[in-house]
């Protein structure tokens, strides 16, 4: 243990404070400011000029040190004031028994003599001026612990000191803070004193004396003898000496002329002599007599109500004890040690002087410390663990020389320099010598409460390092205060240093045996218990401790024990236990080949079912990487063990309880290290052969309980890598483990069978509980081994019992299995299921035809305990995540043959129609043949997809949890949840819809429930945001708005709305469903409710609300896809009640009835749909005389579906479609649609207009053509001229732009269709169509 400068705090806002003071370019800026830190470390105060900054602690996850942030910064109320000193005063409550700090007060001294008190949050509480001189310092003199004295707050001025009792200032500050917290504006409700009572003591200054610093060394009553000597020296022969010395405070002042002064500030009233008393009595009588003669009454005493506020008493001069003069020397700073016995003074001549304050003498002088900063560090002796010793105390002096950048530590009073550190040259050494205000004697409530408080940790000395913005503490071990020549501890410390250096160089050039011998000799030279304990702790903390080194040191301690008077019984027990552990470790790790007389390990006899299970695990976990290296890697791994026994050995020692004298036991809280330790401990033993004779001997010598040894063996198997090529290798290793378990049971003796007949064995029950938490696949193999060993032991004991002869054959026939064996059977069954589950899910696979987005996958924790206790839906959830990571198409999740609960009606009808003459057995056989045929066909069809093979294996173990409907529910949920985290990734939404599309009809109840949950959890709010955005803009928003509100680009919004519409269609289709019941495996216990159960618990969606959401989604999709501009589409196409219903929960019934749409709303909807029909024309494209019209037909189907939902007349929609097709020149497609429209005069008028526009365009081809058309009649010519006028909204624009594009024959057919619709009624346009028909005939001829 050496001196250290440890990091204990971090100041995050260090640069911010530096910039706040305007000193950002000054490296030594800390010298230009005033600073103080709370002795309990919760606050740092800094000030410069009129600026203040308070840094408070905050919680940080990095390390255990304090983290300081800027809590408050501000300026003084008076900008003309300048801060000259700072002090932090932690405050405690009188009623607090633990001494906890409630808040921190900051006392700020100003150049005007004012002292202002602030809270730690920067709120001004109270201010008082005791002397109109600059304040040199504000300090607190704490009372000794468990004393009746009171703390003393004193203010240092250039000519005087002002004392304020702690019991006077404490309630004032608490009262002011209470007023601030309550927000009280009237002081009458919370009375406080305007002036806190204080006592002023004046320095007797002669010549041109200067006071730079002062401090109180003690406030205790001086001893009688010292008091008599002081009075005699001070007053001479006629000195008056009292029987009880008055209480006085000794004040030390550093400055110039004198360099150092010792003063006495006497407290209380001075005792008067008999003559002074007689003089005062005569004066009072004379005054009263004259008052009676002149009819003047004596002055009444002031009443308590009229008495003024307390005022300071008359200043009293301090009595000079002695002074040290030095004309060239000026004292700069003064620091008093804890206890007040010593003080240190720095001066302008680069000297540091140690002063004895009681004797008033200079004890020691250090030279060469320019601008030094000093601090005292008290250190207590630490007691050895488990040994009660008297704690001694030592005092060290820390001197910081900023010019040299060094930090020196000196032992007091006459000790040497014990350490020196290089630190920053711009730092500050911060020293505190006071306790919190309110603790100790300042509580004012008696000594009983103060004695019950716990002592707070005081940071006496801290170093503020601006280079890295950190706060550092100086750690000094106690033994540095001991004498180097006479102390046995110091000698042992020196030997410990040599031992540590020897340990560092053990592997560098020196022979190992010689090094171990020298280390043992050095360890045996340690003669003190404390240093031996330190040596042991040093070894256990080392990460590179070698077993042979540790054994050598332990043997040295045992061979040369300490004297019995030192009370080292517990330490001796620890050493002996460590020796047993080390010997066992070396014996097992250095095991040689098995002896010749050792019987070979018998192969374990396993049942066929166990062999099938083992072979299944080997095939599942075989990845093909180890086939080329059958056994070489396993042997090499064991040979390398001898070179890597450093950290493993330390962990091995740490998992045992070595404090008990009876033996060694495992520590349950270190169970996380059992696996690694057991691998390191037993690997060599298993690799070199099992020598059980020596093994029993080693265990008996180590005094290790058999129960703990069995735990380590099981952990060894569980942590061992599962790398086998075939089943024979597994059985071989299982046989070794079985032999080891059998040996441990032999060591345990009859303790194993200490339980009632046919009850559960406590010995094996602990093993089963350990296997429940196993996360590896080897847990099943260990369970099989232990079950076999336990069964053999039980049967051997049963055969050897004398009661067996009395049992008859019937009893033997029925009583074949015990209760304990039944428990093993249940455990192995569960472990088999979980092992298969873990083996499959631990290896993520990608299917041959991946579908859907990639999702990250982490192999789950598949221990039996986690699977059984995580609820009934855990298997479904884990398998769904595995299937999603495999990117398997959801259609392949469906079972080859539906489960019993999913038989459809057709299969039931077929079963009923079968002949009833066949027996039940024949029916069962035919069904089994049919299923086998289906499986063979499916297997050939899927071309041996590995994922489907593993899924089928999982379904054999978990048939209910892995039904297709349940899996699809979880997969769709996982996809949608992932999409909700990143809305722009629409691939996840598509994958979820693909899962919803694969639900079978019997699973529609699950589908409807999961749709309800997905709507409320993921889709509802993005869809509402899109509706709100389109309602605001009236069209598809720009990309920036979509990114801000929808977290996706504008180009993805139409696709998102289309997918949402598809989801709502799935939602609507699943409304009609049958009842669905869920089944779970019995091994899964109750826990968190599974998702499929929550889905079935959902209320059905309301059809009206679902229809409204579908209509809204359709409108939003049309507006965004066709980029229409519709102002306020939600209020235009939906009434107010419908808009309100769109915000309601989809599975809660509305409290009102939605009204039927009025004529205006229906007209607006019709116009919107007609605009959509016009927009769909852009989807028709023509390429190489081939027309692509499927997209147009697809969206026309959607438009008609929306019209049906709105109950809008579809005739205007079909009319618009026909007209638009004719306008774009698609006459053949339009002619097909005319068959659906029987009687519509408006359609005839529009067709006539299209024909007129075509004729107008054709007339532009030549002059003769125009003359032919004009020769028909003036009425046609006038009609054609009207069509040439500017276009309006009601007019129709044709797509043709050139006369060559007009087909006269098609125009003839168009006129015939127009005439068919106009001739049914006497229309005014019949003459026009007749003349136009004649004109077309002329053009044709």
Swiss-Prot record:
Modified residues (Phosphoserine): 801
Keyword Membrane tagged: yes
Stored Pfam families: RAB3GAP2_C, RAB3GAP2_N
Membrane topology, from the record: Peripheral membrane protein
Organism superkingdom: Eukaryota
Residue ranges, compositional bias (Basic and acidic residues): 906-919
Main location: cytoplasm
GO CC annotation terms, alphabetical: autolysosome; autolysosome membrane; autophagosome; autophagosome membrane; axon; plasma membrane; presynaptic membrane; synapse
The entry's keywords: Cell membrane, Cell projection, Cytoplasm, Cytoplasmic vesicle, GTPase activation, Lysosome, Membrane, Phosphoprotein, Synapse
KO phenotype (gene knockout): Third instar larvae display adherent perinuclear redistribution of lysosomes, autolysosomes and autophagosomes in the fat body.
InterPro entries: Rab3GAP2 (IPR026059), RAB3GAP2_C (IPR029257), RAB3GAP_N (IPR032839)
Subcellular location as annotated: Cytoplasm; Autolysosome membrane; Cytoplasmic vesicle, Autophagosome membrane; Presynaptic cell membrane
MF term (GO), any: enzyme regulator activity
Region (Disordered): 432-452, 896-928
One GO process term, biological-process aspect: regulation of neurotransmitter secretion
Function of the molecule: Regulatory subunit of the Rab3 GTPase-activating (Rab3GAP) complex composed of Rab3-GAP and Rab3GAP1, which has both GTPase-activating protein (GAP) activity towards Rab3, and guanine nucleotide exchange factor (GEF) activity towards Rab18. As part of the Rab3GAP complex, required for the rapid induction and sustained expression of synaptic homeostasis at the neuromuscular junction (NMJ). Also participates in the regulation of autophagy in tissues such as larval fat cells and adult muscles.
Subunit structure: The Rab3 GTPase-activating (Rab3GAP) complex is a heterodimer composed of Rab3GAP1 and Rab3-GAP.
Family: Belongs to the Rab3-GAP regulatory subunit family.
Name of the protein in its database record: Rab3 GTPase-activating protein non-catalytic subunit
Gene: Rab3-GAP
């Amino acid at each position: 243990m050496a001196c250290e400068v440890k990091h204990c705090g971090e100041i995050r806002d260090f640069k911010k404070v530096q910039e706040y003071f305007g000193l950002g370019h000054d490296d030594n800026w800390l010298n230009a400011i005033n600073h103080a830190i709370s002795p309990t470390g919760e606050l740092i105060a800094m000030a410069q000029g009129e600026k203040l900054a308070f840094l408070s602690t905050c919680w940080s996850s990095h390390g255990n040190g304090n983290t300081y942030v800027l809590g408050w910064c501000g300026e003084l109320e008076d900008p003309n004031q300048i801060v000259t000193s700072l002090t932090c005063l932690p405050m405690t409550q009188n009623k607090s028994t633990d001494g906890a700090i409630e808040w921190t007060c900051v006392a700020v001294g100003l150049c005007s003599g004012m002292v202002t008190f602030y809270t730690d949050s920067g709120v001004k509480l109270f201010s008082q001026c005791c002397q109109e001189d600059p304040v040199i310092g504000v300090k607190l003199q704490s009372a000794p612990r468990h004393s009746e004295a009171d703390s003393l707050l004193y203010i240092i001025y250039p000519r005087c000191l002002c004392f304020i009792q702690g019991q006077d200032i404490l309630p004032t500050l608490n009262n002011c803070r209470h007023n601030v917290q309550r927000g009280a504006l009237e002081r009458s409700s919370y009375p406080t004193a305007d002036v806190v009572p204080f006592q002023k003591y004046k320095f007797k200054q002669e010549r041109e004396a200067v006071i730079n610093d002062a401090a109180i060394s003690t406030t205790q009553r001086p001893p009688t003898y010292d008091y008599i000597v002081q009075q005699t020296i001070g007053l001479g022969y006629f000195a008056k000496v009292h029987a009880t010395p008055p209480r006085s405070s000794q004040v030390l002042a550093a400055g110039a002329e004198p360099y150092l002064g010792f003063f006495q500030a006497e407290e209380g009233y001075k005792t008067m002599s008999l003559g002074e008393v007689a003089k005062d009595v005569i004066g009072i009588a004379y005054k009263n007599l004259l008052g009676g003669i002149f009819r003047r009454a004596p002055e009444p005493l002031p009443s308590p109500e009229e008495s003024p506020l307390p005022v300071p008493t008359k200043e009293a001069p301090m009595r000079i004890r002695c002074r040290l003069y030095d004309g060239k020397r000026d004292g700069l700073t003064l620091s008093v040690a804890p206890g007040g016995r010593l003080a240190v003074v720095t001066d302008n001549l680069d000297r540091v002087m140690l002063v004895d304050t009681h004797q008033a003498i200079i004890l020691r002088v250090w030279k060469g410390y320019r601008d030094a900063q000093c601090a005292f560090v008290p250190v207590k002796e630490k007691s050895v663990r488990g040994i009660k010793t008297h704690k001694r105390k030592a005092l060290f002096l820390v001197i910081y020389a900023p010019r040299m950048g060094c930090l020196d530590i000196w032992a007091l009073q006459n000790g040497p320099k014990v350490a020196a550190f290089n630190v920053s040259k711009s730092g500050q050494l911060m020293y505190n010598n006071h306790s919190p205000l309110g603790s100790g004697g300042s509580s004012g409530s008696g000594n009983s409460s103060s004695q019950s408080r716990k002592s707070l940790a005081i940071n006496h000395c801290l170093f503020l390092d601006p280079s890295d913005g950190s706060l550092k503490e100086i750690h000094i071990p106690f033994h540095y205060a001991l004498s180097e020549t006479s102390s046995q501890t110091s000698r042992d410390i020196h030997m410990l240093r040599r031992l540590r250096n020897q340990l560092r160089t053990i592997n560098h050039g020196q022979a190992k045996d010689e090094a171990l011998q020298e280390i043992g000799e050095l360890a045996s030279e340690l003669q003190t218990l404390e240093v031996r304990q330190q040596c042991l702790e040093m070894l256990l903390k080392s990460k590179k401790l070698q077993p042979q080194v540790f054994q050598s040191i332990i043997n040295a301690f045992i061979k040369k024990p300490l004297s019995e008077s030192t009370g080292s019984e517990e330490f001796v027990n620890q050493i002996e236990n460590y020796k047993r552990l080390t010997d066992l470790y070396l014996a097992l790790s250095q095991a040689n080949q098995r002896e010749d007389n050792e019987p070979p390990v018998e192969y374990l006899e396993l049942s066929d079912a166990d062999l099938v299970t083992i072979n299944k695990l080997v095939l599942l976990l075989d990845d093909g990487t180890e086939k080329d290296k059958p056994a070489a890697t396993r042997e090499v791994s064991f040979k390398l063990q001898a070179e890597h026994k450093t950290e493993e050995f330390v962990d091995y020692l740490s998992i045992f309880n070595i404090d008990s004298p009876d033996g060694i036991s495992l520590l349950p809280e270190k169970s996380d290290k059992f696996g690694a330790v057991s691998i390191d401990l037993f690997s060599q033993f298993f690799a070199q052969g099992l020598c059980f004779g020596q093994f029993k001997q080693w265990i008996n010598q180590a005094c290790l309980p058999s129960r703990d040894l069995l735990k380590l063996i099981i952990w060894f198997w569980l942590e061992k890598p599962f790398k086998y090529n075939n089943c024979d290798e597994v059985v071989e290793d299982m046989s070794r483990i079985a032999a080891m378990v059998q040996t441990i049971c032999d060591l345990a003796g009859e303790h194993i069978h200490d339980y009632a007949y046919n009850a559960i064995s406590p010995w094996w029950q602990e093993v089963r509980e350990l296997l429940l938490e196993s996360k590896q696949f080897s847990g099943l193999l260990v369970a099989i081994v232990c079950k076999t060993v336990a069964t053999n032991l039980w049967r051997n004991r049963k055969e050897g019992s004398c009661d067996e002869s009395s049992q008859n054959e019937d009893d033997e026939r029925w009583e074949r299995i015990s209760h304990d064996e039944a428990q093993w059977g249940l455990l192995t069954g569960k472990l088999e299921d979980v092992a298969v589950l873990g083996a499959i899910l631990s290896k993520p696979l990608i299917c041959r035809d991946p579908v859907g987005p990639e999702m990250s996958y982490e192999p789950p924790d598949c221990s039996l305990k986690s699977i059984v206790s995580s609820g009934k839906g855990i298997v479904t959830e884990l398998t769904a995540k595995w299937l999603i990571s495999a990117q398997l198409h959801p259609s392949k999740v469906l079972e080859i043959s539906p489960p019993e609960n999913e038989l459809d009606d057709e299969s039931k009808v077929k079963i009923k129609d079968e002949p009833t003459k066949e027996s039940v057995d024949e029916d069962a056989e035919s069904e089994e043949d049919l299923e086998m045929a289906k499986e063979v066909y499916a297997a050939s069809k899927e071309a041996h997809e590995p994922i489907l093979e593993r899924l089928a294996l999982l379904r054999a173990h978990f048939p209910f949890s892995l039904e297709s409907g349940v899996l699809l529910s979880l997969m769709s949920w996982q996809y949608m949840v992932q999409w909700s985290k990143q809305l722009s990734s629409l691939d996840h939404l598509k994958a979820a819809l693909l899962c919803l599309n694969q639900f079978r009809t019997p699973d529609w109840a699950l589908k409807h429930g999961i749709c309800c949950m997905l709507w409320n959890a993921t889709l509802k709010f993005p869809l509402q945001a899109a509706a709100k955005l389109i309602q605001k803009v009236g069209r598809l928003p720009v990309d920036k708005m979509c990114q801000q509100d929808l977290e996706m680009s504008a180009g993805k919004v139409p696709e998102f709305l289309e997918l949402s519409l598809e989801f709502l269609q799935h939602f609507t289709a699943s409304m009609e469903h049958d009842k669905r019941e869920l089944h779970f495996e019995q091994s899964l216990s109750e826990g968190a409710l599974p998702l499929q159960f929550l889905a079935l618990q959902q209320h059905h969606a309301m059809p009206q609300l679902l229809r409204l959401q579908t209509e809204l989604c359709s409108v939003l999709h049309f507006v965004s896809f066709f980029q229409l501009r519709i102002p306020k589409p939600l209020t235009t196409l939906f009434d107010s009640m419908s808009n309100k219903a769109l915000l309601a929960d989809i599975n809660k019934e509305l409290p009102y009835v939605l009204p039927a749409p009025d004529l205006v709303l229906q007209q607006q909807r019709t116009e919107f749909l007609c605009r959509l029909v016009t927009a769909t024309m852009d989807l028709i494209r023509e390429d190489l005389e081939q027309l692509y019209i499927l997209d147009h037909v697809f969206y026309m189907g959607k438009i008609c579906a929306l019209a049906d939902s709105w109950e809008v007349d579809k005739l205007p929609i079909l009319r618009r479609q026909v007209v638009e097709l004719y306008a774009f020149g698609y006459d053949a497609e339009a002619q097909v649609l005319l068959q659906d429209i029987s009687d519509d005069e408006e359609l005839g008028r529009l067709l006539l207009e299209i024909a007129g526009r075509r004729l107008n365009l054709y007339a532009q081809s030549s002059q003769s053509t125009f003359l032919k058309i004009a020769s028909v009649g003036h009425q046609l010519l006038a009609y054609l001229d009207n069509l040439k006028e500017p276009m309006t909204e009601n007019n129709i624009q044709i797509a043709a732009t050139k006369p060559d594009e007009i087909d006269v024959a098609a125009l003839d057919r168009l006129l015939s269709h127009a005439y068919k619709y106009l001739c049914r009624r006497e229309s005014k346009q019949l003459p026009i169509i007749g003349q136009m028909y004649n004109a077309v005939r002329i053009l044709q001829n």
